[in-house]
């Protein structure tokens, strides 16, 4: 919402059931429709009757998903969503924070705008919140032009979004983080998979949700959308303990450590107080460390 690209008169269709409250606050008084599935059918249905335009004066239709996100760590088929969005004159926006650019090339798959918080890129050392906004190439092969991408670029350039002015320290943190990003992300992905497989075999845990498990509803889709593995996040339900009780027996660092750093971070799903499944959104330590804490 802080980018300012969504304007009054536009419609925003989003799959973000774990952040419904944030959408309500950030887009108050806007035409926002939250869908229950990250599917083409759900987005198309929520867009019916809206006369979208790629003209500057609008109105504009926005489709929003996470490359990995929502309750259950869903993975939408960005290829089919991207094609359907263009047919509907919609602009597909993907929050790529969880998977990161290492784990998902959302712009190549069909997004016109990709957003990514840079906590992980900076290894948790950034002094403030940094978010990268990237627009897809508008010039395609054989001199074809992607009208949606070209229009998204024009909107972003004309909305008055703040230009990033990095201090020398911030630029240094970002540069050093980029040098080690691939190795760190591969370790996160590998350890998340090991943790998911361990939890799936643990009798004290149920409903392990991780795109790399064949039991995940989007496993087949994820194999063609995600790269280098299936992301750094695992979500699960505890059998006889609510999230608050579970957190109380763990060291504070599992809740308070900087996002993107080397320590595992645990959180309970937003909007579901008392639920028995605190999802492990960011796995940072070797799998044994996470497993012993349970």
Predicted segments — roles?
Residues 1-204:
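Conserved PLP-enzyme active-site core in the AAT-like
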Residues 204-291:
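Conserved C-terminal alpha-helix-loop-beta "cap" of PLP-dependent enzymes
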């Amino acid at each position: 919402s802080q980018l300012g690209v969504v304007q009054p008169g536009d419609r925003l269709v989003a799959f973000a059931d774990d952040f419904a409250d944030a959408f309500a606050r950030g887009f108050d008084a806007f035409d926002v429709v939250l869908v229950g599935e990250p599917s083409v059918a759900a987005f198309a249905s929520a867009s019916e009757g809206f006369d979208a335009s790629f003209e500057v004066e609008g109105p504009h239709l926005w489709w929003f998903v996470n490359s990995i996100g929502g309750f259950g760590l869903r993975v939408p088929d960005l290829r089919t969503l991207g094609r359907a969005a263009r047919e509907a004159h919609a602009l597909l926006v993907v929050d790529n924070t969880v998977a990161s650019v290492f784990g998902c090339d959302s712009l190549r798959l069909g997004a016109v705008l990709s957003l990514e918080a840079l906590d992980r890129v900076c290894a948790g050392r950034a002094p403030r919140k940094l978010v990268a906004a990237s627009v897809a190439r508008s010039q395609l092969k054989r001199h074809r032009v992607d009208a949606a991408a070209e229009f998204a670029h024009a909107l972003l350039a004309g909305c008055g979004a703040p230009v990033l002015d990095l201090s020398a320290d911030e630029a240094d943190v970002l540069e050093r983080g980029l040098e080690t990003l691939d190795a760190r992300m591969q370790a996160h992905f590998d350890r998340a998979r090991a943790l998911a497989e361990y939890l799936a075999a643990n009798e004290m845990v149920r409903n392990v949700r991780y795109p790399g498990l064949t039991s995940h509803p989007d496993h087949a889709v994820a194999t063609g959308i995600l790269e280098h593995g299936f992301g750094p996040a695992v979500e699960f339900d505890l059998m006889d303990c609510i999230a608050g009780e579970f957190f109380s027996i763990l060291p504070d660092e599992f809740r308070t450590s900087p996002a993107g750093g080397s320590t595992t971070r645990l959180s309970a799903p937003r909007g579901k107080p008392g639920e028995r499944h605190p999802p492990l959104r960011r796995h940072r330590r070797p799998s044994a460390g996470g497993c012993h804490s349970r």
